[in-house]
């Protein structure tokens, strides 16, 4: 998608509006449970990038997450069948109730509507990634560009405000939604049309 450029304020140092009551009560409860005598705003500030001005140029940006290292393959791919231990793990998975299985830096399998999808892990380093992108005429966003793509320069903790929206369906949170087919809200396209920064367990790579 085309993302227009702008001169924006990035980073975070204080609440623009303030936590809503539900979010503050939950944080205070967690602090009591962990026996932490700290101000929630101070703790959040320590995890944030400093406030700064940035001039962001216009750019064309991929709309969806593309995982590096993981290559989709068919189940009969020789690189899979050469590892009987992986195939045994896959067979055990097929008889389980799990939705996916990842063998660390080796292989992965997930259930789909049509059966199963498998991947193999191809090790690469940062320089190889940059070189491969350059050959395709592509590049990674800088840290400032990435922050702009996520938040558009908003000064609240989240794009929609300072507090959590408890009506949203989010990955890795207790799922209270009875409709399992409902999409995860943070994976929906944002104001730029991008699906970005929606999974804390998926690190997104930037140009550094």
Put a short name on every predicted segment.
Residues 1-139, 144:
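Extended beta-strand/loop cores of jelly-roll/beta-sandwich
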Residues 108, 112-208:
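Functional-site microenvironments in short loops/helix caps that host divalent-cation chemistry
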